[in-house]
């Protein structure tokens, strides 16, 4: 799911994707089959089943934030991938706070030179693994930060059958501090 969602390529979007098993973080490899017949889509709620990974993904948005819930199978290798996309991005994993912060700059023009979409993602489960990737999809194992043209963050954990991992996400075009404020004001 990309965030923000309104014409997201104009607004500097980033995405979250849950996967299991062998780590597939490259955007061309991590996609999953899903059926429109099995999805639930409303203005305030979206749910789908990611068949390739046996994960149920749900999201409910607010104006500047969203609450994600991923229901995992029993697996020793469960991951959530945050892709900050190209045109300049930064990610920083803060394990002791169960948090990823960063920014993305992807856009289709018509924005100021200093345009950034700052984001914060807060998880309700400790991270067993933490990785980032840098330009050209280079995996940086046990890394907590990356900055470049196209970077991302990967956090991982062992999950039990039906275990849910919740993620609170918010963004701001002003600052990381404002993204945190948006998260606290809109979804707590």
What is each residue range found by the language model?
Residues 2-188:
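Accessory carbohydrate-recognition regions in carbohydrate-active enzymes
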């Amino acid at each position: 799911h990309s965030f923000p969602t309104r014409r997201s390529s104009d607004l500097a979007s980033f995405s979250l994707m849950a996967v299991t098993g062998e780590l597939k973080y490259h955007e061309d490899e991590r996609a999953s089959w899903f059926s429109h017949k099995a999805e639930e889509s409303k203005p305030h709620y979206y749910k789908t089943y990611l068949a390739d990974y046996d994960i149920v993904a749900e999201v409910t948005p607010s104006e500047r934030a969203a609450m994600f819930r991923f229901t995992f199978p029993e697996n020793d290798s469960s991951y959530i991938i945050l892709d900050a996309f190209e045109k300049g991005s930064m990610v920083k994993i803060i394990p002791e706070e169960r948090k990823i912060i960063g920014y993305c700059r992807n856009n289709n023009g018509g924005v100021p030179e200093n345009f950034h979409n700052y984001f914060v993602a807060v998880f309700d489960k400790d991270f067993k693994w933490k990785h980032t990737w840098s330009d050209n999809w280079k995996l940086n194992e046990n890394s907590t930060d990356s900055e470049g043209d196209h970077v991302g963050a990967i956090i991982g954990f062992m999950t039990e059958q039906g275990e849910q991992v919740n993620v609170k996400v918010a963004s701001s075009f002003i600052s990381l501090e404002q993204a945190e404020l948006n998260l606290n004001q809109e979804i707590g």
